[in-house]
Every structure is written in structure tokens, then in C-alpha cells.
Amino acid sequence: MAKLTKRMRTIRAKVDVTKEYDINEAVALLKELATAKFVESVDVAVNLGIDARKSDQNVRGATVLPHGTGRDIRVAVFTQGANAEAAKAAGAELVGMEDLADLVKKGEMNFDVVIASPDAMRVVGQLGTILGPRGLMPNPKVGTVTPNVAEAVKNAKAGQVRYRNDKNGIIHTTIGKVTFEADQLKENLEALLVALKKAKPSSAKGVFVKKVSISTTMGAGVAVDQNTLSAQV
């Protein structure tokens, strides 16, 4: 068995894996234990009461977090004409059609999000084997295939997170940085949970949000007592 580092021993001593923590206590604990030499992200894992084997119970979507994610997002937009000008005005770093596709084919992908207008999907469709495995393929379900590309760019820049359950029915995403104020992390988490509950499949029965855990990039998961979150969640 691998020897635990001093840091991991400290984390194990501080975090009670059998306990659900008050949200404020959970955030304070994450901040205390975030001792990496870089600014760690705060991630969340939400266990959903779904059967991920059934396509009609899978959960996928996007929501804008009120305080963003703390990341500078570079956006590429496939579109043309007036939409191209609107995308540039909204802050997109790369805008084009075949010329942008050529960059992608060359491996020049200096962007984090790809957005496309419906008329551009004939070009984007050729890039599925490149963009798909990287999680960059535009999709109408998460608002990245849209006639209103300017709004989509603004949402991406404002801290929109995309979510999709894995094969175990768990949503993994980021809700900010460890340098955020505690209230900012709490409000971002609450906004995500509100969005998830709105996306609950009609065929999912019983408790929908079964467990919520938050962690930092290099830290352990801390389970959150959902009763300590806002009443709107």
C-alpha cells in the first residue's frame, strides 16, 4: 500500500467521511486544507437518483453561475455574416467557418468552448472526431448550437458550466476557486442544484439529489448537508 503523504494524513484526520457538514463548515474546511502551491478549483460531485443506463433518465444541460468559475474562458464561434460580427462584439476570441475548421484540423485549438449557429453545423459536423473526445462539440442541449451566438458567448464568458451525468449517475463540475468568498461558493452551488432539479427527468422516481460533495483539486471530498442550503434549492 502506498505511503500517505503528510498532506493526505492531515486531510484524513480533519475530514470525517461519515458526516454531512453544514455548507459553511464544509467550505471553511476546504479552504483550511487547500495548501497546494497553486489556486485550487472547488469541484462538486452530485449523486442523482437516476438509472444512467436509461437514456430518458440522463441529465445534461448548462447554467450560468452567479459568481462565475474564476477561469478566463476562450471562446471559438462557427458562424458567418451578422452573427460573426455579433460574436466578436460579445468577446469571442475566434470566429469563422472553413478557416476556423482548418485551424482545428491542424490541432490549433486555443479555446475552451465552441459555439455554432445552426447554419454552421455543416462545417462543424466534419470536426466531430476531433472536438467530440475533448468535450468541445457544440450541442443544442447545452446552448452551444444556437441562432443567438452573441448571448451564448456572453454566457460562456460569465461563467457558464455544462453538466452531464456519468455512467454512475453522478454530475461532476466546478463551482469556483478556493480563493472565492464562502458565500460565493455557496451561492454557486445552490444555483447549480436549482438547475439540476429543474432538469429532473419525469421518469426519475424517488429522491433526485441523493448526495452532494465538494472538494478542491488536490483535496478530499466533503459531504454537504443539503438542509443547510437555501430554501430555494
Curated annotation (Swiss-Prot):
GO cellular component: cytosolic large ribosomal subunit
Keyword rRNA-binding: yes
Domain of life: Bacteria
Family per similarity comment: Belongs to the universal ribosomal protein uL1 family.
Gene3D superfamilies referenced in this protein's UniProt entry, alphabetically: 3.30.190.20, 3.40.50.790
GO molecular function: rRNA binding; structural constituent of ribosome; tRNA binding
GO biological process, one term: translation
Keyword terms, alphabetized: Repressor, Ribonucleoprotein, Ribosomal protein, RNA-binding, rRNA-binding, Translation regulation, tRNA-binding
Gene: rplA
Protein name per UniProt: Large ribosomal subunit protein uL1
InterPro entries, per database record: Ribosom_uL1_bac-type, Ribosomal_uL1, Ribosomal_uL1-like, Ribosomal_uL1/biogenesis, Ribosomal_uL1_3-a/b-sand, Ribosomal_uL1_CS
Species in which this protein is naturally found: Vibrio cholerae serotype O1 (strain ATCC 39315 / El Tor Inaba N16961)
Role noted for this protein: Binds directly to 23S rRNA. The L1 stalk is quite mobile in the ribosome, and is involved in E site tRNA release.
Oligomeric form and interacting partners: Part of the 50S ribosomal subunit.
